[in-house]
């Protein structure tokens, strides 16, 4: 058996086209959706991510602002800039690119973003709303994964879902969204005993660990849907995920590739969240 490939590029393109249509309609009403992306330092990977996000927004008709600051920017200055963006009516979404330099408290910086402009969904208020099943914004990567599962017609109600990785950015919100969809959810972390025993139970397996090719085909239930959130460079210098694609593809029923899987969906859902933030400004 060779797994069906879940094409994140094609799905994200359809979502971007829908965003462009809705953004044009909103702009015609006098509100052009606006996203501010804040980058501190010169991390090469972060620069690529930010460039891709800004380009995607502009292509879809959203107003985007990139604010780049030196790595030695003080926390007070960064917080002051976020406060100014909070008060700027032309900006509906604010994204601070992580990771931040070590001297900056990422929790404090995220908490400084107005919850209604927190399009990453990381603010503690938005995390709480997600936990209670009333999300204002769904974090972009888990949101993108849910859209991929939906596009594949995956039945989540009653399914065994296993999430490998328990970060605040992917693992925990991913588990909450799967739980809300009716799945029975197991979250695995670095302390999990016999990880393979857990992953082999999964009808839906989501992996977000940052460890190249750690999930191999013998750890996967035959026919499972495998979502690989990881993006790493292997020893050969090539991009790879947290799942060993070659062996997993022989066992899984469907699988996301790296690149071309979850990554494009993350950017697409950032645009959706920004659009929704702008649309809410027209709602009394």
From Swiss-Prot:
Q: Which organism is it from?
A: Bordetella avium (strain 197N)
The gene behind this protein is folD
What protein name does the entry list?
Answer: Bifunctional protein FolD
The record ties this protein, via Pfam families, to: THF_DHG_CYH, THF_DHG_CYH_C
Enzyme Commission identifier(s): 1.5.1.5, 3.5.4.9
- Answer whether the UniProt record assigns the keyword Mitochondrion to this protein: no
GO MF assignments: methenyltetrahydrofolate cyclohydrolase activity; methylenetetrahydrofolate dehydrogenase (NADP+) activity
Give the pathway listed in the UniProt entry for this protein. Answer: One-carbon metabolism; tetrahydrofolate interconversion
Q: What function is annotated for this protein?
A: Catalyzes the oxidation of 5,10-methylenetetrahydrofolate to 5,10-methenyltetrahydrofolate and then the hydrolysis of 5,10-methenyltetrahydrofolate to 10-formyltetrahydrofolate.
């Amino acid at each position: 058996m060779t797994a069906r490939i879940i094409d994140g590029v094609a799905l994200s393109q359809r979502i971007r086209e829908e965003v462009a249509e809705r953004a044009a309609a909103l702009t015609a009403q006098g509100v052009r959706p606006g996203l501010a992306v804040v980058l501190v330092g010169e991390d090469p990977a972060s620069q690529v991510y930010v460039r891709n996000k800004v380009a995607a927004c502009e292509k879809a008709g959203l107003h985007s602002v990139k604010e780049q600051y030196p790595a030695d920017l003080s926390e007070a200055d960064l917080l002051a800039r976020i406060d100014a963006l909070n008060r700027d009516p032309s900006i509906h979404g604010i994204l601070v690119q992580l990771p931040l330099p070590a001297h900056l408290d990422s929790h404090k910086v995220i908490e400084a973003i107005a919850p209604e402009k927190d399009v990453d969904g990381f603010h503690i208020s938005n995390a709480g709303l997600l936990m209670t099943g009333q999300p204002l914004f769904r974090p972009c990567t888990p949101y993108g994964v849910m859209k991929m599962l939906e596009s594949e017609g995956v039945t989540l109600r009653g399914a065994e879902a296993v999430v490998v990785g328990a970060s605040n950015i992917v693992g925990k919100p991913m588990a909450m969204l799967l739980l809300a969809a009716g799945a029975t959810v197991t979250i695995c972390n670095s302390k999990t005993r016999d990880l393979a025993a857990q992953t082999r139970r999964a009808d839906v397996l989501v992996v977000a660990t940052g460890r190249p090719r750690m999930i191999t085909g013998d750890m996967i239930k035959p026919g499972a849907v495998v979502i690989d959130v990881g993006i790493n460079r292997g020893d050969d210098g090539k991009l790879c995920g947290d799942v060993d694609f070659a062996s997993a593809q022989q066992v899984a029923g469907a699988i996301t590739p790296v690149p071309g899987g979850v990554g494009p969906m993350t950017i697409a859902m950032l645009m959706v969240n920004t659009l929704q933030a702008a649309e809410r400004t027209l709602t009394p």
